[in-house]
Amino acid sequence: MNNRKVELTRKTRETDIKIKLNIDGNGESHIDTGLKFFDHMLESFSRHGFFDLEINVDGDIEVDDHHTIEDTGLLLGKCFREALGDKRGINRMGYSIVPMDESLSTVAVDISGRSYTVFNATFQYQYIGDVTSQNIKHFFESFAMTSQMNINIKAEGENDHHICEVIFKALARSLNDATKITHNQILSTKGKL
């Protein structure tokens, strides 16, 4: 198995981000985005996907959370894309159904080289902790764009925290399955992903 680890940075006038990712990790994480609820979601993502993940963000959260969440999604997606290399041997697709109390999420991914996001979930309130709820969808769109994955998300429930958390957990489990190396082929009739 190739070494599927990567360390990348992204620096703009709005954010300064450093991410270390080990796809074949143990679910260990150190996350500091400046947004406690977002940290909690990314920690859940790391734990349930068995990805080792370090994220440090210095973002303009005095403005709002948009740039921090968007740019973290962009860089994390790029980390996955680079760590997977030519994608030889991976399952390519994965899905998961995750419950949490009254909430349920189904997430399916295809590491196809084509970016697309379907997000079928709604939140009752404008904020979940210190995060604007509309930026949750934007995180997944940003992640899908740079990872070049198709991500299809469906979630329902009554508690916004639970809905958001089951989405992150279901994505993690889906990606854990999709990134597993189980053969020596590139699963595409084109010969590349």
Curated annotation (Swiss-Prot):
It catalyses: D-erythro-1-(imidazol-4-yl)glycerol 3-phosphate = 3-(imidazol-4-yl)-2-oxopropyl phosphate + H2O. GO terms for molecular function: imidazoleglycerol-phosphate dehydratase activity. It comes from the Archaea. Keywords: Amino-acid biosynthesis, Cytoplasm, Histidine biosynthesis, Lyase. It is found in: Cytoplasm. Coiled coil: none annotated. InterPro entries: IGPD_sf (IPR038494), ImidazoleglycerolP_deHydtase (IPR000807), ImidazoleglycerP_deHydtase_CS (IPR020565), Ribosomal_Su5_D2-typ_SF (IPR020568). Its EC number is 4.2.1.19. One of its GO terms (cellular component) is cytoplasm. Disulfide bonds: none annotated. Pathway: Amino-acid biosynthesis; L-histidine biosynthesis; L-histidine from 5-phospho-alpha-D-ribose 1-diphosphate: step 6/9. HAMAP family: HisB. This is Imidazoleglycerol-phosphate dehydratase.
